Amino acid sequence: MNGVINIYKNTGMTSFDVVAIVRRVAKMKKVGHTGTLDPAASGVLPVCLGKATKIIDYIMENKKVYRVNLKLGMVTDTYDLEGEVLREEDASHITKDEILNCINSFLGTIDQVPPMYSALKQNGVRLYELARQGIEVHREARKITIYSIENIKIESNDNIQMDVCCSKGTYIRSLCYDIGEKLNVGATMTALERIQNGTFTKEEAINIEDLTEELLEKHIISIEKALDSFEKITVNEKFGKLLRNGVKVFDNRMYSEEVEFNKLYRVYEDNGVFLGLGKRDEKGFKLEKLLIEE
């Protein structure tokens, strides 16, 4: 069985718990998820089976959409409700306009400092392991992109909800923390749900607790379909043969579409055969990942 199953992970489970269940249902070992969701978070977690594990890194590059709830006036060491409360402040004087202006100031490409309670490593040690020992170290800010923040609901300063569309590597907990710091009252994330990962949506996801062999076979998505978020280009069979053999082709006659530099495309031969993912640079076009079904 080769393909991707769009799973909905419930709170209280690790992402590896989900993989273990899929392995058991599918009766196969070659299974992997496409980006960790914390146990306290729920939501969309595409899981790759068989040859589809080759495309895990590409699915992880997808834009993500998260539905997040945050509370103003409280800061914890983990930036969420799992941690120890470090300080509490009165946030009742903060107006809705101030909150909206602050939230919208984070749109675009920004520098974000990852939280201490994260799986990132420093000198070979995971940050959360240092944090549990009471050690805080300097973390370099990383470039991330917030594409949009929509459906903002301010029920009270204790409950703000919003949908955040962001790039790979974004820590929503850190976004909540940074919003609180900019408002000078602190903030903590109180709930997190991933509602979309590229073309994989919450509405089409199978709850992991409902997964059966029958549902898996019915809803598994082909490798080709799972890469729908990448634009498609078509080459003729002559050039397709060269690409299959790992040749970098420098010939603009190869494709009829406008092909940008350093951008991944789904590559098809003009007979409809899907070859894989390819990229153009100054020296030509080459398949980065051959995915043809032999």
Curated annotation (Swiss-Prot):
NCBIfam families: TruB. It catalyses: uridine(55) in tRNA = pseudouridine(55) in tRNA. This is tRNA pseudouridine synthase B. GO terms for molecular function: RNA binding; tRNA pseudouridine(55) synthase activity. It comes from the Bacteria. Keywords: Isomerase, tRNA processing. The lineage of its organism: Bacteria, Bacillati, Bacillota, Clostridia, Eubacteriales. The active site is at D38. Its EC number is 5.4.99.25. The gene is truB. GO terms for biological process: mRNA pseudouridine synthesis; tRNA pseudouridine synthesis. The keyword Aminoacyl-tRNA synthetase does not apply. Responsible for synthesis of pseudouridine from uracil-55 in the psi GC loop of transfer RNAs. InterPro entries: PsdUridine_synth_cat_dom_sf (IPR020103), PsdUridine_synth_N (IPR002501), tRNA_psdUridine_synth_TruB (IPR014780), TruB_C (IPR032819).
